[in-house]
Amino acid sequence: MILSGKEILKHIGEDIIIEPFSEERINPNSYNLTLFNELLVYKNDTLDMKIPNETEKLIIPEEGLLLEPGKLYLGRTNEFTQTNKYVPMLEGRSSTGRLGLFIHVTAGFGDIGFAGYWTLEIFCVQPIRIYPNTEICQIYYHNIDGEYDLYNSGKYQNNNGIQPSLMYKDFEK
């Protein structure tokens, strides 16, 4: 079952952490998260799962940054989130989707216990100008049934910035 906006609000600061938090961004069953002012792009057209792929940092100026179709941009939320009780999920807002802007390719599912900034896998179907601090996506929370363990992977936990793929670490086991 998905938590209502009123339930999210009740649990802020205890079972749900969103920092910074603004009550105006609560929706009926989600909370709007905003876009940080930096992006990463991969330097090479061909990527390799078994190695760290080099990235380049782009700054999103106040006047906006034009994104190109067919290119993956990695961004992040301004907000740090954490919950040890609910399953966090991330989705694009319908307003961004109607502009042909995807904010995640496959990683919209979070784990109980994840603490950090959400890395956004941004992709557009046509050129689009984006702006920093835009309400770009929404987080919502599911209850979980049964016993569970908290997320304990060191790969992305407590990140401080945009996280490129760390899949190469899976091959080091």
From Swiss-Prot:
Pathway: Pyrimidine metabolism; dUMP biosynthesis; dUMP from dCTP: step 1/1
GO MF, one annotated term: dCTP deaminase activity
EC number: 3.5.4.30
Keyword terms: Hydrolase, Nucleotide metabolism, Nucleotide-binding
InterPro entries attached to this UniProt entry: dCTP_deaminase (IPR011962), dUTPase-like_sf (IPR036157), dUTPase_trimeric (IPR033704)
The keyword Nucleotide-binding is assigned to this record: yes
Site (Important for bifunctional activity): 108-109
Active site: residue positions: 121
Enzymatic reactions: dCTP + 2 H2O = dUMP + NH4(+) + diphosphate
Gene3D superfamilies xrefs: 2.70.40.10
Coiled-coil positions: none
Binding site for dCTP: 93-98, 111, 119-121, 138, 151
Biological-process GO terms, alphabetical: dUMP biosynthetic process; dUTP biosynthetic process; nucleobase-containing small molecule interconversion
HAMAP family listed in its UniProt record: dCTP_deaminase (MF_00146)
NCBIfam families per UniProt: dCTP_deam (TIGR02274)
PANTHER family: DCTP DEAMINASE (PTHR42680:SF3)
Summary of subunit composition and partner proteins: Homotrimer.
Similarity comment: Belongs to the dCTP deaminase family.
Purpose of the protein: Bifunctional enzyme that catalyzes both the deamination of dCTP to dUTP and the hydrolysis of dUTP to dUMP without releasing the toxic dUTP intermediate.
Protein name, as recorded: dCTP deaminase, dUMP-forming
Organism: Clostridium botulinum (strain Alaska E43 / Type E3)
Lineage: Bacteria, Bacillati, Bacillota, Clostridia, Eubacteriales
